[in-house]
UniProtKB/Swiss-Prot annotation:
Name under which the protein is recorded: Allergen Asp f 7 homolog
Low complexity: compositionally biased ranges: 48-107, 117-129
Species of provenance: Arthroderma benhamiae (strain ATCC MYA-4681 / CBS 112371)
Compositional bias annotation for Pro residues: 130-151
Region (Disordered): 48-161
Amino acid sequence: MAPQFLKALTVATALGATLATALPVQPKPTVWHTTTQVVVKTITKTATVHGTPGPDYTVPPAYTTPAAPTVPTDAPQQPSYTPVPSAPTPSSSSSYSAPAEPSSSSVPAPPPPPPTTTSTPAPEPTTSTTPPPPPPAMTTPPPPPPPPATKPPVVSIPPIGGGGSTYTGPCAAGSPCTGEITFYDGGLGACGTNIDTNGEDAIALPIELMGPLSNNNPYCGKQVQISYKGKTATATVKDKCAGCTGNNIDMTRFLFYKLIRFPVAFTNSSNSGVEADGRIHGVEWHFI
Protein backbone atom coordinates (compact mmCIF):
# COMPACT_ATOMS: atom_id res chain seq x y z
CA MET A 1 0.00 0.00 0.00
CA ALA A 2 2.78 2.37 0.85
CA PRO A 3 4.71 1.76 -2.32
CA GLN A 4 1.68 2.53 -4.50
CA PHE A 5 1.07 5.80 -2.69
CA LEU A 6 4.62 6.85 -3.14
CA LYS A 7 4.50 5.89 -6.75
CA ALA A 8 1.43 7.99 -7.30
CA LEU A 9 2.94 10.92 -5.44
CA THR A 10 6.09 10.70 -7.52
CA VAL A 11 4.13 10.72 -10.75
CA ALA A 12 2.09 13.72 -9.65
CA THR A 13 5.17 15.61 -8.63
CA ALA A 14 6.89 14.90 -11.91
CA LEU A 15 3.83 15.98 -13.88
CA GLY A 16 3.58 19.23 -11.95
CA ALA A 17 7.23 19.97 -12.54
CA THR A 18 6.78 19.29 -16.23
CA LEU A 19 3.83 21.67 -16.49
CA ALA A 20 5.67 24.34 -14.57
CA THR A 21 8.61 24.03 -16.90
CA ALA A 22 6.56 23.95 -20.13
CA LEU A 23 4.38 27.02 -19.42
CA PRO A 24 6.39 30.24 -19.05
CA VAL A 25 5.17 33.10 -16.95
CA GLN A 26 3.08 35.56 -19.07
CA PRO A 27 4.10 39.28 -18.74
CA LYS A 28 1.52 41.80 -17.66
CA PRO A 29 0.11 43.73 -20.70
CA THR A 30 0.33 47.56 -20.72
CA VAL A 31 -2.82 49.33 -21.92
CA TRP A 32 -2.54 52.98 -23.11
CA HIS A 33 -5.70 55.17 -23.16
CA THR A 34 -5.61 58.51 -25.07
CA THR A 35 -8.08 61.23 -24.13
CA THR A 36 -8.58 64.34 -26.41
CA GLN A 37 -10.00 67.44 -24.77
CA VAL A 38 -11.21 70.39 -26.94
CA VAL A 39 -11.46 73.75 -25.23
CA VAL A 40 -13.25 76.67 -27.00
CA LYS A 41 -12.54 80.15 -25.67
CA THR A 42 -14.64 83.20 -26.54
CA ILE A 43 -12.96 86.59 -26.20
CA THR A 44 -15.18 89.64 -25.98
CA LYS A 45 -13.75 92.98 -27.18
CA THR A 46 -15.48 96.30 -26.74
CA ALA A 47 -14.70 99.20 -29.10
CA THR A 48 -16.02 102.73 -28.79
CA VAL A 49 -16.74 104.44 -32.12
CA HIS A 50 -17.45 108.14 -32.20
CA GLY A 51 -19.73 109.47 -34.90
CA THR A 52 -23.32 109.51 -36.00
CA PRO A 53 -25.15 106.41 -34.73
CA GLY A 54 -26.64 104.17 -37.35
CA PRO A 55 -29.88 102.26 -37.33
CA ASP A 56 -30.66 99.75 -34.59
CA TYR A 57 -29.09 96.35 -35.06
CA THR A 58 -29.71 93.17 -33.06
CA VAL A 59 -26.59 91.06 -32.45
CA PRO A 60 -27.24 87.38 -33.24
CA PRO A 61 -26.26 84.77 -30.63
CA ALA A 62 -22.70 83.55 -30.67
CA TYR A 63 -21.91 80.43 -32.61
CA THR A 64 -21.09 77.39 -30.42
CA THR A 65 -18.56 74.96 -31.78
CA PRO A 66 -19.64 71.37 -30.98
CA ALA A 67 -17.19 69.33 -28.92
CA ALA A 68 -15.17 66.76 -30.78
CA PRO A 69 -16.28 63.19 -29.95
CA THR A 70 -13.99 61.15 -27.77
CA VAL A 71 -12.49 58.22 -29.64
CA PRO A 72 -11.84 55.27 -27.29
CA THR A 73 -8.60 53.42 -27.71
CA ASP A 74 -9.02 49.65 -27.62
CA ALA A 75 -6.19 47.65 -26.13
CA PRO A 76 -4.96 44.70 -28.19
CA GLN A 77 -6.53 41.48 -27.10
CA GLN A 78 -4.26 38.71 -25.91
CA PRO A 79 -4.75 35.26 -27.34
CA SER A 80 -6.89 33.13 -25.12
CA TYR A 81 -5.51 29.82 -23.81
CA THR A 82 -6.73 27.09 -21.58
CA PRO A 83 -4.24 26.25 -18.87
CA VAL A 84 -3.63 22.65 -18.05
CA PRO A 85 -4.67 22.11 -14.51
CA SER A 86 -1.76 21.56 -12.25
CA ALA A 87 -1.75 20.54 -8.77
CA PRO A 88 0.18 22.93 -6.60
CA THR A 89 1.21 25.86 -8.87
CA PRO A 90 -1.65 27.68 -10.54
CA SER A 91 -0.88 30.02 -13.45
CA SER A 92 -2.39 33.46 -13.09
CA SER A 93 -2.20 36.61 -15.26
CA SER A 94 -3.38 40.01 -14.21
CA SER A 95 -4.19 42.92 -16.60
CA TYR A 96 -3.99 46.55 -15.46
CA SER A 97 -6.08 49.14 -17.22
CA ALA A 98 -5.57 52.79 -16.41
CA PRO A 99 -8.80 54.52 -15.54
CA ALA A 100 -10.12 56.68 -18.37
CA GLU A 101 -10.23 60.34 -17.65
CA PRO A 102 -13.58 61.85 -18.15
CA SER A 103 -13.86 63.92 -21.32
CA SER A 104 -15.24 67.33 -20.72
CA SER A 105 -15.65 70.33 -22.95
CA SER A 106 -16.46 73.64 -21.43
CA VAL A 107 -18.10 76.18 -23.75
CA PRO A 108 -18.60 79.57 -22.13
CA ALA A 109 -21.99 81.12 -22.56
CA PRO A 110 -22.12 83.95 -25.16
CA PRO A 111 -21.94 87.44 -23.71
CA PRO A 112 -25.17 89.37 -23.55
CA PRO A 113 -25.73 91.69 -26.52
CA PRO A 114 -24.79 95.33 -25.93
CA PRO A 115 -27.67 97.62 -25.12
CA THR A 116 -29.21 99.33 -28.11
CA THR A 117 -28.70 103.05 -28.02
CA THR A 118 -30.93 105.26 -30.11
CA SER A 119 -29.77 108.82 -30.55
CA THR A 120 -32.10 111.47 -31.84
CA PRO A 121 -30.25 114.25 -33.70
CA ALA A 122 -30.95 117.72 -32.47
CA PRO A 123 -33.14 119.75 -34.82
CA GLU A 124 -31.29 122.22 -36.96
CA PRO A 125 -32.03 125.86 -36.27
CA THR A 126 -34.35 127.43 -38.76
CA THR A 127 -32.84 130.44 -40.46
CA SER A 128 -35.23 132.92 -41.98
CA THR A 129 -33.67 134.67 -44.95
CA THR A 130 -35.38 137.73 -46.33
CA PRO A 131 -34.94 137.88 -50.11
CA PRO A 132 -33.38 141.08 -51.40
CA PRO A 133 -35.76 143.59 -52.92
CA PRO A 134 -36.18 143.24 -56.67
CA PRO A 135 -34.03 145.54 -58.77
CA PRO A 136 -35.76 148.64 -60.02
CA ALA A 137 -37.44 148.24 -63.34
CA MET A 138 -35.30 149.47 -66.18
CA THR A 139 -37.06 152.18 -68.06
CA THR A 140 -36.17 152.12 -71.72
CA PRO A 141 -35.98 155.64 -73.05
CA PRO A 142 -38.12 156.22 -76.09
CA PRO A 143 -36.22 156.04 -79.35
CA PRO A 144 -35.16 159.38 -80.72
CA PRO A 145 -37.37 160.73 -83.42
CA PRO A 146 -36.18 159.90 -86.92
CA PRO A 147 -34.25 162.65 -88.62
CA PRO A 148 -36.23 164.60 -91.12
CA ALA A 149 -36.04 163.34 -94.64
CA THR A 150 -33.33 165.02 -96.60
CA LYS A 151 -34.80 166.95 -99.41
CA PRO A 152 -32.84 167.20 -102.61
CA PRO A 153 -31.28 170.57 -103.06
CA VAL A 154 -33.27 172.92 -105.13
CA VAL A 155 -31.29 173.86 -108.17
CA SER A 156 -32.06 177.25 -109.39
CA ILE A 157 -32.19 177.10 -113.14
CA PRO A 158 -31.95 180.47 -114.78
CA PRO A 159 -34.85 181.39 -116.97
CA ILE A 160 -34.36 180.50 -120.58
CA GLY A 161 -35.78 182.74 -123.23
CA GLY A 162 -37.05 181.78 -126.60
CA GLY A 163 -33.57 182.07 -128.11
CA GLY A 164 -31.71 184.72 -129.95
CA SER A 165 -31.10 187.97 -128.21
CA THR A 166 -33.79 187.24 -125.60
CA TYR A 167 -31.72 184.37 -123.92
CA THR A 168 -30.08 185.68 -120.78
CA GLY A 169 -28.67 182.45 -119.23
CA PRO A 170 -25.18 180.96 -119.41
CA CYS A 171 -23.65 180.20 -122.81
CA ALA A 172 -25.71 182.87 -124.58
CA ALA A 173 -24.94 184.14 -128.07
CA GLY A 174 -23.06 187.15 -126.74
CA SER A 175 -20.94 185.02 -124.35
CA PRO A 176 -20.51 181.53 -125.89
CA CYS A 177 -19.00 178.65 -123.89
CA THR A 178 -15.75 176.99 -124.95
CA GLY A 179 -14.97 173.38 -124.15
CA GLU A 180 -14.35 169.88 -125.48
CA ILE A 181 -16.56 167.59 -127.54
CA THR A 182 -16.74 163.78 -127.57
CA PHE A 183 -19.09 161.26 -129.21
CA TYR A 184 -21.16 158.38 -127.80
CA ASP A 185 -23.59 155.68 -129.00
CA GLY A 186 -26.84 157.40 -128.06
CA GLY A 187 -29.83 155.36 -126.82
CA LEU A 188 -32.53 156.52 -124.40
CA GLY A 189 -31.66 160.04 -123.30
CA ALA A 190 -32.34 161.82 -120.01
CA CYS A 191 -35.05 163.89 -121.68
CA GLY A 192 -37.08 160.72 -122.37
CA THR A 193 -36.48 160.24 -126.11
CA ASN A 194 -34.28 157.83 -128.05
CA ILE A 195 -31.15 159.16 -129.70
CA ASP A 196 -29.87 157.82 -133.06
CA THR A 197 -26.13 158.33 -132.94
CA ASN A 198 -25.71 157.62 -136.64
CA GLY A 199 -28.62 159.69 -138.01
CA GLU A 200 -29.30 162.91 -136.06
CA ASP A 201 -27.64 165.98 -134.58
CA ALA A 202 -28.16 165.67 -130.80
CA ILE A 203 -26.04 166.60 -127.79
CA ALA A 204 -25.85 165.93 -124.04
CA LEU A 205 -25.19 168.93 -121.80
CA PRO A 206 -22.95 168.64 -118.69
CA ILE A 207 -24.81 167.62 -115.50
CA GLU A 208 -23.46 170.68 -113.70
CA LEU A 209 -25.45 172.85 -116.08
CA MET A 210 -28.67 170.81 -116.41
CA GLY A 211 -29.00 169.87 -112.72
CA PRO A 212 -30.72 166.74 -111.29
CA LEU A 213 -34.01 167.20 -113.13
CA SER A 214 -34.35 164.98 -116.20
CA ASN A 215 -37.56 164.61 -118.25
CA ASN A 216 -39.03 168.01 -117.37
CA ASN A 217 -35.71 169.82 -117.52
CA PRO A 218 -36.11 173.23 -119.18
CA TYR A 219 -33.00 172.64 -121.29
CA CYS A 220 -34.54 169.59 -123.01
CA GLY A 221 -35.33 170.41 -126.70
CA LYS A 222 -33.32 173.63 -126.81
CA GLN A 223 -31.22 174.40 -129.91
CA VAL A 224 -27.47 174.88 -129.67
CA GLN A 225 -25.09 176.24 -132.32
CA ILE A 226 -21.61 174.63 -132.35
CA SER A 227 -18.57 176.09 -134.19
CA TYR A 228 -15.16 174.49 -134.76
CA LYS A 229 -12.49 175.88 -137.12
CA GLY A 230 -14.96 177.64 -139.39
CA LYS A 231 -17.45 174.77 -139.41
CA THR A 232 -20.86 175.38 -137.82
CA ALA A 233 -23.69 172.96 -136.98
CA THR A 234 -26.98 173.17 -135.09
CA ALA A 235 -28.00 170.44 -132.59
CA THR A 236 -30.88 169.66 -130.18
CA VAL A 237 -30.44 169.03 -126.42
CA LYS A 238 -31.75 165.46 -125.73
CA ASP A 239 -29.53 164.05 -122.98
CA LYS A 240 -27.43 164.76 -119.89
CA CYS A 241 -23.69 163.89 -119.67
CA ALA A 242 -22.73 162.69 -116.17
CA GLY A 243 -19.02 162.52 -117.02
CA CYS A 244 -18.73 165.93 -118.60
CA THR A 245 -17.21 168.74 -116.53
CA GLY A 246 -17.10 172.46 -117.11
CA ASN A 247 -18.41 173.38 -120.56
CA ASN A 248 -17.62 170.04 -122.22
CA ILE A 249 -20.46 168.38 -124.18
CA ASP A 250 -21.13 164.94 -125.64
CA MET A 251 -22.71 164.39 -129.09
CA THR A 252 -23.78 161.77 -131.63
CA ARG A 253 -21.32 160.30 -134.09
CA PHE A 254 -23.30 161.86 -136.91
CA LEU A 255 -22.72 165.40 -135.51
CA PHE A 256 -19.12 164.71 -134.46
CA TYR A 257 -18.13 163.64 -138.00
CA LYS A 258 -19.94 166.64 -139.48
CA LEU A 259 -17.80 169.08 -137.46
CA ILE A 260 -14.52 167.31 -138.04
CA ARG A 261 -14.75 166.50 -141.80
CA PHE A 262 -17.47 168.84 -143.03
CA PRO A 263 -18.62 169.25 -145.90
CA VAL A 264 -17.73 165.59 -146.78
CA ALA A 265 -20.90 163.44 -146.61
CA PHE A 266 -21.10 161.14 -143.57
CA THR A 267 -20.25 157.47 -144.27
CA ASN A 268 -18.76 154.84 -142.00
CA SER A 269 -15.90 154.22 -144.40
CA SER A 270 -14.91 157.86 -144.95
CA ASN A 271 -15.10 158.82 -141.23
CA SER A 272 -13.60 155.72 -139.58
CA GLY A 273 -10.31 157.49 -139.04
CA VAL A 274 -11.99 160.46 -137.33
CA GLU A 275 -12.85 158.43 -134.21
CA ALA A 276 -9.15 158.14 -133.49
CA ASP A 277 -9.13 161.84 -132.67
CA GLY A 278 -11.36 161.07 -129.67
CA ARG A 279 -11.70 164.31 -127.70
CA ILE A 280 -11.63 167.61 -129.60
CA HIS A 281 -10.56 170.81 -127.80
CA GLY A 282 -11.42 174.48 -128.45
CA VAL A 283 -15.03 174.09 -129.57
CA GLU A 284 -17.45 177.04 -129.06
CA TRP A 285 -21.17 176.62 -128.53
CA HIS A 286 -24.17 178.71 -127.38
CA PHE A 287 -27.96 178.55 -127.16
CA ILE A 288 -29.97 180.11 -130.02
